[in-house]
Amino acid sequence: MTSPDTVAISPVDDIVADMRAGRIVILVDEEDRENEGDLVLAADHVTAEAINFMARYGRGLICLTLTRERCEHLQLPPMTARNGDKKGTAFTASIEAAEGVTTGISAADRARTVQAAVALGAKPNDLVQPGHIFPLQAVDGGVLMRAGHTEAGCDLAAMAGCTPAAVICEIMKDDGTMARLPDLQVFAAQHGLKIGTIADLIEHRSRVESLIEKVGTRTIQTAYGEFTAHAYRDKPAHGIHLSLVKGEWAPHDAVAVRVHEPLSVLDALETNRAMHSWSLDASLAHICAQGKGVAVLLNCGESAAQLLAQFAGTARAAHGPERERMDLRTYGVGAQILRDCGVHRMNLMGSPRRSPGLTGYGLEIVGYITQ
């Protein structure tokens, strides 16, 4: 039971209804006490009052989530040539409305900039750079592809019948630290806001949508034993990914799982590559020893330059302190492949890292297996 001074998590339909009505909502990754939250508003409904509320009470950076298609239409370049953000947040160059603003920083000016960016007939010359609004480019496939607030903002706005764009702002406490779920529940009660989760949004969408299509199945003989291999087409990126399945299990069983990304031709040649916490050979050997498990081999479309970098040993490792979560380009694809293979509970082979939204796919990490 929640007290009268806090707010419980609302179902996705209620969050969408508030977005459709032009109300601000709070969005967290999932129902976990440590989760931070963002204020989210469908960009079509932006007002100076809404921007002022975010600036006064949210206190974080006010951003505008946009689809890749809209960013390309507006000719918004990436903020930096190499994105070093741990969460893969895709900032573009900051923007300002070309007309109708003064200094650009006032609530009214920022609302005007958002309106200019999401207008039906918006053109690149309707905006100038830099400015006081920070666009974020969502990945194709939305939260099914990347479990981020950027994608959730676009998805929820689209589900509400609005332009797939949202104004978002992180919520901080009075002392400048990030508000966590218990703080957010009190904040929501004080301001009459609903709280939703990205995990619920993923579950809602994945019930009726899929990022993958199984295109082939056959038995494959490896040096460590026989596996059933499945090939999947990645609908957003059109790549082909593989899963290697060993044995059978009950829905409640925790099985060994290795998500191997990015898949490189060199993985099949070198058994001691430093690119991965588990080599492909070691992964298959461990799964065979367990008698059951799944290895998902994600193909990230390795370019000639990337292959050369791996050959020369200059590519970044797929594990280590800077890699806190799965590859964000293929996160949802890997999750849907695991679900299609019958995985519900897993012992993940690799170093512990944050994996937001997995509950939305019906997946639970029971533990981690490190070498």
Positions of PLM-derived features:
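Catalytic domains of riboflavin
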Residues: 1-371
